[in-house]
Amino acid sequence: IDKYWENQPFYPQSKAFIHDLKYAGKAGRDKIYDIQESLAATFIDYYILTSLDSIAWLLNIRGNDIDYTPLLCCFAIIPQKGNVELFVEEKKIRSIKNELEKFVNPHSFESIYEFIGKIGKDKIVGMDKKQTAYNFKKICLNSNITINYLSNPCTYPKAQKNEIELSGARNANIRDGASITKFLYWLKNIMKISETNEIKAADYLLNLRKEHELFYS
């Protein structure tokens, strides 16, 4: 598709930032240890992780590469031991590089293909069949690397919210509920139908939500 798609939009270049521990509830290093234990139990040497929300959760990082979703365009490879290999444009993580390098080895985005090719034919690589591009499978097969199709190991741990995450979700709903209440009052008692349309109403609600300290969009 890239060969024939003219006038493609520019590749997103947002800057990554750390999702603070006071909101995450668990350090990235600790999450990595847990995932690596699950890889060891299934005899997987490396796991190719392409799910952006899983990478964001695992490393406690966020970005703004996708509208309305705080994600960073990147890939990750989780080894059974040691630092996670993160493939992302260097300028995106420059401001948080020192923090990340405590548990991450950063690489250029495109170098993931070369990295996989050099893993070694005696290694077992895990990947989620539903989430991983065929190109990664092809590289593994061409390099005589054994593939073990395994569901994304971050999915269930990410779904099991810790107490800080649960508290954050509840507080977010309380804040948003206050915005909705103000909006409904405005809709019923103040709004003039002749001067308002759906877009103006949506903008009014958005501005109410923006009044809260932790609003992000």
Identify what each model region corresponds to:
Residues 1-217:
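Active-site neighborhoods and metal-handling regions in enzymes and metal-associated proteins
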